[in-house]
Amino acid sequence: MSPRLPAVTARELLAILRRHGFESVRQSGSHLVLRHADGRRTTVPVHSGKTLGRGLLRQILRDTGLTADVLTS
């Protein structure tokens, strides 16, 4: 069974992704595209303080190759 994902805002997630080597590439409206030096990329919707849905958060983790553990550390 997978661990329950914590409630995370886009701002918090962006800080975590940047700590793991992701950089902003471009922004289209409220969607920020980030890319890692090894080619992994993902899109994060940035909406004023709202928490990201669990399904979206799970997909972003899958896109980036990170685990749910990085969200709690």
Where are these regions (language model features)?
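Basic nucleic-acid-binding interfaces
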Residues: 1-73
